[in-house]
Amino acid sequence: MERGMTDRRHFLKASLLGASASALAWAGRLAAKQVESAPAFAGSRVVSTWDFGVAANKAAWTVLSNGGHALDAVETGVQVPESDLKNHSVGKAGYPDRDGHVSLDASIMDADGNCGAVAALEHIEHPICIARLVMDRTPHVLLVGEGALQFALAQGFKRQELLTPESDKAWHEWLKTARYQPTANSEVRDYGHGSAIGMPGGAGNHDTIGMLAIDAQGRLAGACTTSGMAWKMRGRVGDSPIIGAGLYVDGEVGAATSTGVGEEVIRNAGSFLVVELMRQGRSPQEACKEAVLRIIRRRPAQTKELQVGFLAMNKRGEVGAWAIQHGFSYAVCDEKKQDVLIPSQSVYTTSFS
């Protein structure tokens, strides 16, 4: 009798587990089918983070509007802020680490999962170009530090000093107090849309340009580049060059990028999470919001004083964004809109601009 009861319990348990597994598999197939059946976007579009994304988008649009590849468009586009001497969170004018060294991070990815990245790269103005070459000319995904510099020089890039007089002055001002605290939405000061707080760059600077594009053939691509946190510890690397954190692209679904305090994005594999949420049927906006809320749920106290924002675009060309703090914005460029800057929704409404 007891053995019969045990057998029945095992049978019922196995049946329930089997039913649950079948239901989960069915839900997964349904979500995948919804993604596969969604119509592709007819046209080209490029989106990017922050105010400086407007100029970057225009450069990318010159590629897209002439029938170019989305991958070439994003590489071209983000080179604009990399060369912009007003921009202290990306490229050659970026603020240095606490030892006075300017180090740059970047990543690039296409719809087929091909990707390349560099981190802690010094003396090269355009890290995004080196990331592209890592993708195209090596079997690797990520090169860092001295090895990344050696590779860049071997590819014909010229070594140059990236510490500008303005950045050097700001660094020496910081050394007087040597206190590091990231400031939310720090890039806004450099582009005249917010009030200056303290010295140039404030107490810290941690913002990034992330760019996503879809071309006329429906191909998706993304790029992300930054000089990272101002006054960071030497060797610190944030989310921007980490595939799945600062950037992720899947041609079956869409693409996502992030900005803000990279450590929080890395802890949650943020951009990968956004793309997977879109795969499950969420809109870009909904996916970005859920990724932000997940960061907040894990670290509720810390996130009240820092910024993280996500920007996403699915393969239908639909765009969405969400941030922890008020002040994050993104730029959109397509055949109808050439220089549109859109404020993102946020969890908290306190303005840090």
Segments and roles (model prediction):
Residues 2-19:
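N-terminal secretory signal peptides and thylakoid transit peptides that target proteins
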Residues 7-12, 32, 221-228:
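Well-ordered, non-transmembrane segments within structured domains
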Residues 21-27:
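Hydrophobic h-region of N-terminal signal peptides that target proteins for export
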Residues 38-188, 194, 198-321, 325-327, ...:
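Proteins synthesized as precursors that undergo proteolytic processing into mature forms
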Residues 329-331:
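Assembly/interface hotspot detector across virion components, adhesins/toxins, and nucleic-acid enzymes
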Residues 334-336:
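Extracellular/periplasmic ligand-sensing ectodomains of membrane signal-transduction proteins
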